[in-house]
Design a protein with these regions (language model features):
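Transmembrane helix-loop-helix hairpins at lipid-water interfaces of multipass membrane proteins
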Residues: 1-58, 134-166, 240-247, 251-260, ...
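Membrane-integrated ABC transporters
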Residues: 1-9, 28-44, 62-66, 83, ...
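ABC-type nucleotide-binding domain
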Residues: 309-310, 315-569
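Extended non-transmembrane interhelical loops and adjacent amphipathic helices
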Residues: 70-114, 176-219, 291-302, 452-453
Length: 569
C-alpha cells in the first residue's frame, strides 16, 4: 500500500493533464464530429476515478495497519520495560539518576517506536513519489527537478536544530517533571490528602506545581517562537520556488513549448513534488527526533544489571541456620556504613528480636538477608552456603518478610492474602487459615463480600480499611508462607493494640517452632518473648543476649525497657 500511495498521485496528475488536452482538442473541432473526443474524455475520467479509489483504499489500509500496530507495539515496548524492571535491584529504584532513566523511557515508550516506523514508511512513500515526479519534470526541465529538491532543505536544517534543542530540554527537566507528577499525586491521592488538608498544604504544593510549569513554559515558549519564526521564513522560500516554477510552466505554455494539458500536469506534479519534499524532510527530521527519544529507552534497556549467578537449591549444612560474618554495608553516596562488621548466628527454631533506634540498621540487615542488597564487605551464609550461591527464587521462597512499609494492594481480600504464597493464592482454605493466624478473619467476615471484597479506594465498590486492619492483612500474607524456613516481621504491628499484638505473636511463635523467626519491634512486651535479642546502635551490635541477661547488664536495652515501662506506670 505504501508503494501505491507513492506512485498514484503522480499518475493522477498525468491523467488530469491528458484529460485537459482531450477537452481542449474537442473544443477546437468547431462543430465537427467530436464523438471520439467524448469517448477519450470519458476514459480519462474513469481512469482517474479508478486511481483515486485505489489511492483512498491504500490510505485506509495504511491507517488500519497503523492502528493495529499502535496497540501491539505499544504493549510490546511496555512489557519490555516492565520485564527489565523485574531484573533490577532495589538500589536501582532508590537511585534518583537511574529512576529518571526509567521515567524517561516509560514516558515515550508507547508513541515513539510506532512514530519511527510510520515515518520510515512515509519517507519510503515520499521517495517513490519524488522519483516518479522527477521523471515527469525532467522531461520539462532538469532544473525544475533540482529546484524541487533544494526548496525544502533550509526548513529541514532549521527544524533539525530545534528538534535537538527540544530533546535536550526534555532530558534536562526529567527531575522537575517527576516532581510535578509527585505533587499531583500528593494533591489527589487518598493517602496524601488528609495531611494536605490538616496542615493546609494545598496552596503551597499547588504554587510549587505552577512555578515548575511556568519555568518549563518560559523555555518552551522561547523555543516555539523561534521555531515558528524560522519555519515561516523558510516556508516563504519554498512558496517562492513553487510560484517561480508556476510562472515558468505558464510562460512555456504561452510560447507553445508545452500544451495546456501538460501545463496543468506539470503544475500539479510540481505541487505534489514540493509536498513530497517537505514531507520527506519532515519524516527524516522526525526519525532523527524519535531516535533521540528512543535513546532513552535504549539507555534504560541496555543498562547492565549484575547477573544473579547462584544456582544452588540447598546448602551443605541443613541445620546451620543463618550466619552473618563480619558484614558491612554502605549506601551509595553515603560516607558512613549503615551496618558495620556485623557477626550473628541464628539457628533453626530460634527466635531473634532486634531493637534499636530508627536508622540504626535493623531493616538494612533484613534487606541483606533477602538479597535486596549485597554486602559491601563480609559474607552471609544460609545452611552453610553463601547467599550469592543460592538460586535467587529458591532463596526468596525460603524467606517470608513483612516490612513496616508493606504494600496495600488494591485487590480483593483473598488475593491480598493469597499472594503471600503465589502457587496457592487461589486456595481459599489456605487463605482463611492464614487470615485466622493474622487475626484478620474477624473483620473480614463483616465485609460485604467477605474474602471477595475489593479493598482500597481505587476501584468501584472498594472498601478502605483502618491502619490496624491493613496490618493484619499484611500479617496474614506472611502466614501464607508455610514452606518458609525464615519468617521476618519488621515493625508490622505498629497500628495494632498491645493485646492484639500479643495474640498475633503467640500465633507467630507457634507457626515458627522449627523455623528461624526474626522480629523487629519497639514494643518490649513482644521483644522479651524472643530467645535471643540484639541491640543495634549506629549500624553496630552493641548488646546481645536474652531478656533477663540484657536487663542484668543494665546497658542500653535495660534503659530503653525502663523508659517504656514507665509509660505504663
Amino acid at each position: 500500500s505504501t508503494l501505491v500511495t507513492g506512485v498514484v498521485p503522480a499518475a493522477i496528475a498525468s491523467v488530469g493533464g491528458l484529460f485537459v488536452d482531450a477537452v481542449a482538442n474537442s473544443l477546437l473541432q468547431n462543430g465537427n464530429d467530436f464523438s471520439d473526443f467524448r469517448q477519450e474524455v470519458l476514459i480519462y475520467v474513469l481512469v482517474e476515478l479508478g486511481l483515486v479509489l485505489l489511492l483512498t483504499a491504500s490510505q485506509r489500509l495504511n491507517m488500519l495497519c497503523q492502528s493495529i500496530l499502535r496497540a501491539l507495539l505499544g504493549n510490546k515496548i511496555n512489557v519490555m520495560i516492565l520485564e527489565k524492571a523485574l531484573t533490577l535491584e532495589l538500589g536501582h529504584f532508590e537511585d534518583s539518576e537511574y529512576y529518571d532513566k526509567l521515567v524517561r523511557a516509560r514516558r515515550e515508550a508507547s508513541s515513539r517506536p510506532l512514530s519511527l516506523i510510520v515515518k520510515t514508511f512515509d519517507l519510503f512513500r515520499d521517495v517513490i513519489t519524488l522519483v516518479t515526479i522527477g521523471i515527469f519534470l525532467f522531461q520539462f526541465s532538469a532544473w525544475a527537478s533540482i529546484l524541487l529538491l533544494i526548496a525544502g532543505v533550509p526548513a529541514f536544517a532549521a527544524e533539525n536544530k530545534f528538534s535537538g534543542e527540544a530533546f535536550r530540554n526534555q532530558r534536562r527537566r526529567s527531575a522537575e517533571r517527576r516532581l510535578q507528577v509527585y505533587l499531583e499525586m500528593v494533591l489527589t491521592r487518598e493517602d496524601g490528602v488528609k495531611e494536605v488538608k490538616l496542615f493546609q498544604l494545598g496552596k503551597h504544593f499547588l504554587k510549587r506545581y505552577i512555578d515548575i510549569f511556568n519555568r518549563i513554559y518560559r523555555e518552551d515558549k522561547s523555543l516555539v517562537l523561534r521555531r515558528t519564526a524560522w519555519g515561516y521564513i523558510f516556508g516563504l522560500l519554498a512558496s517562492l520556488s513553487f510560484y517561480f516554477a508556476y510562472g515558468w510552466v505558464g510562460f512555456s505554455a504561452i510560447l507553445g513549448v508545452i500544451t495546456i494539458g501538460q501545463m496543468t500536469m506539470y503544475i500539479a506534479q510540481f505541487r505534489i513534488g514540493q509536498n513530497a519534499v517537505t514531507s520527506s524532510l519532515t519524516a527524516i527530521n522526525g526519525m532523527y527526533e524519535d531516535n533521540l527519544y528512543l535513546s532513552n529507552l535504549d539507555e534504560y534497556m541496555n543498562h547492565e544489571v549484575p547477573e544473579l549467578s547462584g544456582t544452588k537449591a540447598y546448602g551443605p549444612i541443613r541445620g546451620d541456620g543463618v550466619r552473618f560474618e563480619d558484614v558491612s554495608f554502605i549506601y551509595p553516596g553515603s560516607a558512613k556504613p549503615a551496618l558495620d562488621k556485623i557477626s550473628i548466628h541464628i539457628k533453626p527454631g530460634e527466635s531473634l528480636a532486634i531493637v534499636g533506634e530508627n536508622g540504626s540498621g535493623k531493616t538494612t540487615l533484613i534487606k541483606l538477608l533477602t538479597r535486596l542488597y549485597k554486602p559491601t564487605s563480609g559474607r552471609i551464609f544460609l545452611e552453610g552456603l553463601d547467599l550469592e550461591e543460592w538460586d535467587i527464587d529458591v532463596l526468596r521462597k525460603k524467606v517470608g518478610v513483612i516490612f513496616q512499609d508493606f504494600n496495600r494492594y488494591q485487590l480483593v481480600v483473598g488475593e491480598n492474602i493469597g499472594i503471600g504464597d503465589i502457587k496457592d493464592s487461589d486456595d481459599l482454605e489456605r487463605v482463611q487459615e492464614a487470615a485466622q493466624k493474622g487475626m484478620a478473619d474477624s473483620f473480614i467476615k463483616d465485609l460485604p463480600d467477605a474474602y471477595s471484597t475489593q479493598l482500597g479506594s481505587w476501584f468501584k465498590n472498594g472498601r478502605e480499611l483502618s491502619g490496624g486492619q491493613w496490618q493484619k492483612i499484611a500479617l496474614s500474607r506472611a502466614f501464607m508462607r508455610k514452606s518458609a524456613d525464615i519468617l521476618v516481621l519488621d515493625e508490622p504491628t505498629a497500628a495494632i493494640d498491645a493485646k492484639a499484638e500479643a495474640e498475633i505473636f503467640a500465633h507467630f511463635r507457634e507457626l515458627t517452632k522449627n523455623r528461624i523467626s526474626i522480629i523487629i519491634s519497639h514494643r518490649f512486651s513482644t521483644v522479651r518473648m524472643a530467645d535471643h535479642i540484639i541491640v543495634f546502635e549506629k549500624g553496630r551490635v552493641v548488646e546481645e543476649g536474652s531478656h533477663p541477661e540484657l536487663i542484668e547488664k543494665q546497658g542500653i536495652y535495660e534503659n530503653l525497657f525502663e523508659l517504656q515501662a514507665q509509660g505504663y506506670k
